[in-house]
Amino acid sequence: MNDAVTKPKTRTKTKVERPKLHKVILINDDYTPREFVTMILKAEFRMTEDQAYKVMITAHKLGACVVAVFTRDVAETKATRATDAGRAKGYPLLFTTEPEE
């Protein structure tokens, strides 16, 4: 007699999820000079002069504008660095992040 117990082979699939993306948003204020905002957008977000100007004007007209979309850590780092650059010069420049839907 054969008393061997046979177990079915089970496979586990590891599902790899992509990281959630977050938007970096420029909030308009009435004190930070346009040229400074454009300079920060070019430096921190590697935008061209034209791209930075369009984002800055959109934020000025609408009150806020999505600057870029990154993974959460990158978005928060860039938003913090850009906001800190404004604060270092005494401007109330503000970048925030929120999850992309």
UniProtKB/Swiss-Prot annotation:
An annotated GO BP: protein catabolic process
Database matches in Pfam families: ClpS (PF02617)
InterPro entries in alphabetical order: ClpS, ClpS_core, Ribosomal_bL12_C/ClpS-like
Gene3D superfamilies hit by this protein: 3.30.1390.10
Domain of life: Bacteria
Function statement: Involved in the modulation of the specificity of the ClpAP-mediated ATP-dependent protein degradation.
HAMAP family reported in the protein's UniProt record: ClpS
Subunit structure: Binds to the N-terminal domain of the chaperone ClpA.
Record family assignment: Belongs to the ClpS family.
Protein name, as recorded: ATP-dependent Clp protease adapter protein ClpS 1
Gene responsible for this protein: clpS1
